[in-house]
Amino acid sequence: MKSKRAIKIFTWVSVGIVVLASGVWLGLGQVSGSIKRIDVFGKLTNRPDRVSTAMNYLVVGSDTRIGLTKAEIKELKVGSRKVADGARSDTMMLIHISKKRDKAVIISIPRDTYAVIPAHISMDGKKSIPETPAKINAAFNWGGAPLLIKTLESMTNLRIDHYVEVSFLGFKSMVDALGGITVCSKVPINDPKSHLVMAAGVHRLDGLDALKYVRTRAFDGMGDLGRMQRQQQFVSAVFREATSSGVLLNPIKLNNLLKAVLKTVQTDSELNQGDLVTLAKQIRNLRPGKVRTLTVPLANTNYFTPAVGSAVLWDPELAPDLWNRLRKDLPVIDVVKNKTDKSIKKVDKFKTRTASENPCGSLK
């Protein structure tokens, strides 16, 4: 069975929680020492220039089952630990935090994105592999986080500052530490692949059911694109929950949440203590209405080439426009002034949502 990769959706909040807590209540040494770090940038060359002090995080979801019980693995229908030996990922989000630290943009990148994987050395260091067209998930499988970063930077001309990787267990633990997450579906869901059966309307999901919710993709005919929309809605719900319930401002709740997440999160080795403290102070007042989510603009969801097969092709005009705006830390929403009546109109050509929105209106 194909592994399900849904962990990406909660990681912006995880980053915020880890960062905020590190400099506020738990003690920098304790928190920083608890995070597993890996070197992902050390051997990268010819990288894009950093043209502003905005920050770009690449967040990747690992499909490792480590930490899940046999009953949970069976309930999730994700295959055994043996079947999923090691950690694989082909889902990702890029999180842009503005230079003033008052806005954020979260971009979902489809796992089947058509890409040209740069020339690289094989994982065992024995073979030189030339530039190769493939789906973007191949970059992680062939060369881990460094090759994935190199591929994305070559496609976007956007410098990635930090890397965060999370797991199934990390997602489940975080939702449970929050006491569950409230979601709303406009339509009933009955997905035999994710084992999720849910009536239309408002639901409070625990960690296991939340994992089913963000994995579901076999009930509405929209596949991964529909799943990404639900994932964006879910991360917005997590952000609303964390801020409205006072979790980020409550030392006890934050401590419990941080403990649940730290065991299953790893970051790049350059995300040091000073970075955490500084960013913690800067983003603590970031609100859901200032966080926008979107999928990278697409031109073709069934782009076929003999070498790659069916893939997802980015829009050749809108996608470069989006990356250029993030590179220069420019707004993703255009404000247009009418010359005749001086009225102001907002143009959202990237079809974004804010984390303060939800698909069913008020969840009261």
Residue ranges and their predicted role:
Residues 2-364:
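Non-catalytic, solvent-exposed segments at the cell envelope interface
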